[in-house]
């Protein structure tokens, strides 16, 4: 804050001059104590001057309404929304989100440091504060092929950027626990004193070793017991509610008045249709309160706790000297803000956004570098008398299970089996590195005919296709190759629906309405082809390639047993 600004703030705080804006008569949430108090919020420029009784050049009556700090998302991947950052900003601001902490490892897996720099550029000078944690695992493991390999040396020039706060989720937890040199190099990056964690199911001495490396948070807990152990060992707990990982209600029983201040809320990977229809962090608060959890604790998690976890001491509370990032709600049941201020400026009024996002600063480059896609690549010779490892989908989770099944075969080759819901799954390397193709089997999609394809395939984002028919699988793969990446549904040899994602094969260059319309078409066709209502087909598909979440995955290099952290044969 400049001295001249501080002089004005202090004069208004003393009540000697009118504030620029005063929110009058609201029920104000105190993030420090969890209390509510009736009063005014006085704002000068970007700063809160005081709480109490004030007059202002502009006064906004919020009597009977609930006033809170702007909400924060402690961990998300912008790319997972499938819209560009500036388009996402519009959605988040409408939901009262004023600060986010993003890990751009999706685009970094495709474009390397150029992708991180693009995200930094695209989030400059917008009314949403976007901070970044540098991707720590590109690729996530050596058991897949990404578009680049990010070493500590490549990341170091980005450390000094003012919106880079540390190192993103350390997914290579075996490498961390066992002190792998490349992992330790990244943990030692100058300036990266904060490091987010990713340790699904890690406990006991392995958890001790993981956290002793300097990692200080985790968002992968799925049970209250796991959450409590991580809290006891000093990690910040980020309670996640994502499109494919619904963990919030399972974790909230671990939150108590004594440990609440070490807890934050996170959306991780949340799809656009759910952001638009349900919301973001505000929706997580709504879920929690609807199930009887104290709104005060949930608000602390979404504001002050998150700010303090990332050592940002200028936000997260309605108090003198803090940023004037503010939400006003009609009630504590429906958390859709009626008024949102960002840096002291009204940005949302009566659920209408008062900001127009500028266009993309850079035209997308083609990132689809596949070699020829051929039917022969999909062939799996049957191994008589041997069972195959099959990836089993767990509904509403990104975890998978491993099954051992005698697959259906025709003419000596494995084929999809709709009666037992066992489908063929393929991953094509798309970065132009080696032309690999991995082929496996998956159970739980419910698909009765056709094929689904996606270049959103965590974390290396190769091309993944699941299908009943090899020819439809090939048609879907070729369609996305020609489109520059995206999502596609194919049946009877025809593309039934497609969403092009020309930004690294991950994000659209179109507006929310366009993307939403295309997603609705895709969802319609997945249902038509048999996918049950409780399976988010494309979100589920996108995580079947992630070799750091138990238990069985498929990469371009083959089947990955995450427990063994090794490539395994299809046949037992």
Where are these regions (language model features)?
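Active-site mouth loops of central-metabolism enzymes
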Residues: 73-84, 139-150, 216
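Divalent metal-coordination and catalytic microenvironments
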Residues: 26, 46, 64, 75, ...
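Histidine/acidic residue-rich metal-binding segments in metalloenzymes
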Residues: 115, 149-168, 172-239, 245-265, ...
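Short, ordered loop/turn segments at secondary-structure junctions
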Residues: 104-107, 135-137, 172, 200-201, ...
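Active-site neighborhood of phospho(di)ester-bond hydrolases with catalytic His/Asp-centered motifs
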Residues: 68-74, 102-105, 133, 168-170, ...
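Active-site microenvironment of metallo-dependent hydrolases
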Residues: 1-44, 52, 93-95, 276-292, ...
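Divalent-metal coordination cores built from histidine and acidic residues
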Residues: 3-12, 89-194, 495-499
